[in-house]
């Protein structure tokens, strides 16, 4: 329950923070970078402890909650503000997410998250549960790369020059992977604590990896 709540909060928070552009040294990016990688860390923890089936349900729950938030924000943005209210423009900048960007974001999230979970699950089986750090980093690279390759062309194609797209994708994936590596010691401790506390360490033997099969098997 705790991880489900935290996962959904991270996704919704990232959605809001994505509306701000920030600079870290020479690199420009969206502020969603601050929190979005946490969702991949939670994905790794849940998949490592409870398996792909539970992670699959978590991803769809996060998608549903994020979709609800974006939809309610769009409706509120569509309703005219009171005549005395001066925050209409600022509110629109946050909640007036263009359908193209919203659609690209949702598709990229689902594909990236499931790629991350699939790699994590399959590598746990092949390694007999060893090398968690390597599996966590590699699954993050796979998930984040998928997310970025889908999102940026669909959301920003034609808005920014196509020749800049590869460097933008590489920068995003690199920074998010570095984020994962920096917090990896914390992730390892969280996984160990959760396994011991819940007495769970699921291996996905015989797992059906159909993303639309909403059960634990």
Q: Where does each model-flagged region fall?
A:
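Hydrophobic transmembrane alpha-helices
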Residues: 1-63, 67
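Alpha-helical transmembrane segments and their lipid-water interface positions
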Residues: 18, 22, 69-80, 112, ...
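Membrane-interface interhelical connector segments
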Residues: 75-100
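Internal alpha-helical transmembrane segments of multi-pass membrane proteins
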Residues: 126-145
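Pore-lining and gate-forming transmembrane alpha-helices of multi-pass membrane transport proteins
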Residues: 139, 167-180
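Interfacial helix-loop-helix junctions of multi-pass membrane proteins
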Residues: 153-163
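Short, highly charged, low-complexity non-transmembrane loops/tails of multi-pass membrane proteins
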Residues: 191-217
